[in-house]
Amino acid sequence: MAFFKLFGVVCRCCSAKYRELWLVCERGNDARDNGYWFYRYLKEKHPEINVRYVIETDSADRAKIQALGGMVPRGSFFHYLAYYCADFLIGTHVQPCAPDLILFYHLAGKGIRARGKQVFLQHGIIKDEMEWLHRKNMYVDLFVCGAKPEYEYIRDTFGYPEHVPQYVGLARFDNLI
């Protein structure tokens, strides 16, 4: 991991490809939910943003990402490098865009994290207690909420600083319009 962190610093200095990078992902094997719709929005409406999407090369959804451009093969050398270079790690799961979710979850618990701001898009509206999403168990810089009651519940009970949970809606809802 230290190698990739160090190599990431060098790449950010030497290549614009790795500067101001936004990395988006869902589970790593699909592109159908909030991660995909957010990515598509950025590619179509904000082409000035250096954004890439992490997905497995044998995914049934790979063609959708390739059509938009910016595919990062999950688990590849480029994936590790992009993970450590990214300014924003945006995903629908814990440890957004991590090359190995379990490993990076445990490393984060010990304070070893990637440099990028972590954005948790999530999949849907939280209505029940989910202790693993509390601040003491998960580090995120932005926790996207899709409904006002959900936002209030997370804000009041999950232990995050006031600026972390934000009521902005879910990206996939935009596809319904």
Feature names for model-found ranges:
Residues 1-28:
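Membrane-proximal basic amphipathic "stem/tether" segments
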Residues 20-177:
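Active-site and donor-binding regions of nucleotide-sugar-utilizing enzymes
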